[in-house]
Swiss-Prot record:
A single GO molecular function term of this UniProt record: O-acetyltransferase activity
Domain of life: Eukaryota
GO CC annotation: Golgi apparatus; Golgi membrane
Lineage of origin: Eukaryota, Viridiplantae, Streptophyta, Embryophyta, Tracheophyta
Family note: Belongs to the PC-esterase family. TBL subfamily.
Organism: Oryza sativa subsp. japonica (Rice)
Chain positions carrying an annotated carbohydrate: N192, N218, N351, N363, N471, N508
Topology class, membrane: Single-pass type II membrane protein
Name this protein carries in UniProt: Xylan O-acetyltransferase 7
Disulfide-bond pairs as recorded: C243-C296, C267-C332, C276-C584, C499-C580
Tissue and organ distribution: Expressed in roots, leaves and stems.
Function noted in UniProt: Xylan acetyltransferase required for 2-O- and 3-O-monoacetylation of xylosyl residues in xylan. Catalyzes the 2-O-acetylation of xylan, followed by nonenzymatic acetyl migration to the O-3 position, resulting in products that are monoacetylated at both O-2 and O-3 positions.
Active site: S321, D579, H582
Length: 605
């Protein structure tokens, strides 16, 4: 009887609650009597109306729920409007009341059965209610955070990293150049060379017209070359005959059809000194400029064709680190045509002065020999040669020249090591340069740089004329490789430092030429000595003027210093550490070797 009475009392309370709620619907402006008196009952009603989701709320637990905060306490007495309903726990009015009542009423037929045979029920505990309440709070919190996040202003960006900005600016160069230049045109013909590239950027070089570039020679073609290949090379010889290879323009090859000739990642023989991209450079635009001679085309570089010319032969680069730079380029150009396991590189042969790349299938070698002055000097050690006080023996060449015998293609250079001083120290003794206990003799004379350069080349030319068989050996002399230390020479900005951050060639060359520090006296000396040679014809590869435009192609701060990569702090100090002498690879030295290839193909044909 007691349980029945309690049930009737609860029903009466719900009836009064619904009546007051209906009255409040007609007067919604003020806190209702039902809200003030029956808010705890509303919560109990919600709890009892969802028996399968939320068990009835224990009376001992209710104060903990409704009195958690001062805000809810004030709401219970009607001092505040109801808080935003995270889970719609508001008084149910109107149609919602009827739906609640309908859900609470059991089916008529099921009521007696349920009364007679009540199903066993586990008494719900506070933990089950707490779990349901926690789930509702999690959902409400998620919805609140989502809405709140949409209204919040975006977080402020952190202060920019200047180094990252520099790298980003460097990286944008490729996209800018690609937007400025159309894709490379179809293969050019000699009769339409100028018009085919009119839509591309052209950088012209004014040159004197007295260059003797008529190609020919006494050597015969290599044996074992296919007839089709011979016909192709003969046609290329006709294309080159009478062509001024070194007068022309730089053309940006946006499509990359002809430049670069290989990828940095594809050549495992490159040293860290020249791998600029691997060392942190962000743009590769310096790799995409190709040289377009005036009035002709360079033959397409064919590594297999060159290896056929080198079959059973030796090619050797002799000189300073710029010739080593070019030698590395040549190794990368030919190695792509050689299968894995059929190519090797041996360094520091013959007391360290000789490096040998060998293509075993062709029995061919591409070698480099260290001799920065060609004649003997106190800088001849290939690894420890940073000597401030340089001394040369301008009549002593036999020691180095003994390693040049039997070579079929000799490529010489000497220039950059002459630029430290305006005067060179030259030994007075005509004998061996070493005296006494093995040290260099202190008896020397200071000689003007150009005069000493001429005497050294005369010593070298005499050896070539006497020792080289022109029917077996072809000799090339590379002109001066320029440096770029003076931004004011090409109109650089006020804050420009050497060649650092340069990303494009020089485009504002005047008819009088550039003055970037190249010693053109040595250029004239070299040409004069070569013209005086009668027995052996030496090909002068005149790369100086066209290379002066390439301020963008140096290794700059993306290189080594004393055998170690520059640190970020050193890279940030280009005034001290930028290398504006050597060149990135792939890069400008590939063009120099393209000239060699053109001459070798023409001679062989």
């Amino acid at each position: 009887m007691k349980k029945k009475k309690n049930g009737m009392g609860a029903a009466a309370d719900r009836g009064r609650l619904l009546a007051l709620a209906h009255h409040d619907k007609l007067n919604p402006t003020k806190p209702s009597e039902a809200q003030r008196r029956f808010k705890p009952s509303i919560l109990l009603l919600l709890g009892s109306s969802l028996p399968r989701l939320v068990p009835p709320l224990p009376s001992s637990f209710l104060p903990v729920v409704i009195k958690q905060t001062e805000f809810h306490q004030r709401w219970l007495v009607g001092d505040l409007n109801p808080p935003p309903p995270p889970c719609h726990l508001l008084p149910i009015q109107g149609q919602g009341q009827m739906q609640m009542q309908q859900r609470r009423k059991p089916p008529p037929a099921a009521a007696p059965v349920a009364a007679k045979q009540p199903s066993p029920r586990r008494t719900p505990g506070p933990l089950s209610f707490a779990g349901a309440l926690l789930s509702l709070l999690v959902v409400a919190t998620f919805l609140y955070i989502n809405d709140h996040g949409n209204m919040m202003p975006p977080h402020a960006s952190p202060d920019p990293d200047l180094r990252l900005l520099q790298e980003a600016a460097h990286q944008k160069v490729n996209s800018i150049l690609l937007s400025r230049h159309a894709p490379a045109p179809p293969p050019r013909t000699n009769t339409n060379t100028s018009s085919s590239d009119q839509h591309l950027r052209l950088i012209n070089i004014p040159m004197s017209s007295d260059l003797d570039l008529e190609l020919g020679g006494n050597s015969t073609s290599s044996s074992g070359v296919e007839i089709q290949f011979e016909q192709q090379q003969q046609q290329e010889e006709k294309n080159l005959r009478g062509c001024e290879l070194y007068k022309g323009r730089w053309v940006y090859d946006a499509a990359g059809r002809e430049a670069p000739l290989y990828r940095e990642s594809e050549c495992g023989f490159l040293t860290e000194q020249v791998t600029c991209m691997r060392n942190g450079r962000r743009d590769d635009s310096y790799q995409r400029w190709r040289w377009q001679p005036e009035g002709c085309d360079l033959p397409s570089f064919d590594a297999r064709a060159l290896l056929e010319r080198l079959r059973n032969k030796r090619m050797m680069f002799v000189g300073d680190s710029l010739n080593r730079n070019q030698w590395e380029s040549m190794v990368c150009l030919v190695q792509s045509a050689i299968p894995y396991g059929q190519k090797t590189l041996t360094k520091f042969v013959n007391n360290g002065s000789l490096n040998v790349f060998r293509a075993h299938e062709y029995n061919a070698t591409v070698e480099f020999y260290w001799a920065p002055f060609l004649v003997q000097s106190n800088s001849d050690d290939p690894q420890v040669h940073s000597v401030r006080d340089r001394v040369i023996a301008w009549r002593s060449i036999a020691k180095h020249a003994a390693n040049w015998k039997g070579v079929h293609y000799l490529v010489f250079n000497t220039y950059i090591w002459w630029l430290n001083n305006f005067q060179i120290k030259v030994l007075k003794s005509r004998g061996a340069p070493f005296a006494g206990s093995g040290g260099w003799s202190s008896r020397y004379a200071l000689v003007d740089r150009a005069i000493a350069y001429r005497e050294v080349l005369k010593t070298w030319a005499k050896w070539v004329d006497r020792r080289i068989d022109p029917n077996k050996t072809h000799v090339f002399f590379m002109a001066m490789s320029p440096n770029h230390f003076m931004p004011e020479a090409w109109g650089g900005s006020a804050g420009a430092v050497k060649c650092a951050m340069e990303t494009q060639p020089i485009v504002n060359r005047t008819s009088g030429g550039l003055d970037i520090g190249t010693d053109w006296r040595l250029h004239g000396v070299a040409r004069g000595v070569l013209r005086s040679m009668r027995r052996v014809g030496v090909r002068f590869v005149d790369i100086t003027a066209l290379s002066e435009l390439r301020k963008d192609a140096h290794t700059s701060v993306h290189t080594l210093r004393q055998g170690k990569l520059l640190t970020p702090e050193q890279q940030a100090d280009p005034r001290t550490y930028a290398d504006c002498i050597h060149w990135c690879l792939p890069g400008l030295p590939d063009t120099w070797n393209h000239f060699l290839y053109a001459h070798i193909v023409a001679h062989a044909a």
